[in-house]
Design a protein with these regions (language model features):
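Sec-dependent signal peptide recognition
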Residues: 2-9
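N-terminal signal peptide c-region/cleavage motif recognized by signal peptidases
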Residues: 15-17
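A generic "folded-domain core" signal
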Residues: 19-149
Length: 149
């Protein structure tokens, strides 16, 4: 009986960090499918962030950033802050219970492509002074879609 308890405790102890490590691998990994680059990361509070770059390095490139944050949607039009500078973006907020999902859409291809070039130079983007977008494998993204938001 004692061996079973020790084995069970060891299994729980070692499997929890293993599962945690498995979950972490899903963040900060770039994927590509149908000419769309996808990345998921998180805010400093642990809320998920989804970044999608459509048609990167083309004249039709655009960017969508969506993330969950605490609070209610209000009438104020939020701005997208990238590396300390405001980037022209269309803003939309969706209320989900006590939280909200902020969506930013950037349609200026030159701005989007400069962000892609910046990331491909192995630099990290900082969005909203809180969200780090890592370059990691953006030069050789995995094929497929990111995990569910």
């Amino acid at each position: 009986m004692n061996r079973k308890s020790i084995a069970l405790a060891a299994l729980v102890f070692f499997s929890a960090p293993g599962w945690s490590a498995f979950q972490e691998r899903e963040y900060n990994t770039w994927y590509i499918k149908n000419a769309v680059l996808y990345d998921m990361t998180q805010t400093s509070d642990g809320f998920p962030v989804m970044v999608s770059i459509f048609q990167p390095e083309r004249k039709s490139a655009n960017l969508v950033v969506s993330y969950i944050t605490e609070g209610r949607c209000d009438d104020n039009n939020q701005q997208l802050n990238v590396n300390g500078k405001v980037l022209a973006a269309k803003y939309r907020c969706v209320q989900v219970g006590q939280n909200r999902i902020d969506h930013f859409s950037v349609v200026d291809a030159n701005s989007v492509n400069s962000l892609v070039t910046y990331l491909k130079s192995d630099f990290t983007l900082l969005l909203q002074n809180d969200i780090k977008i890592w370059a990691v494998n953006i030069k050789t993204p995995k094929y497929g879609l990111t995990p569910r938001f």
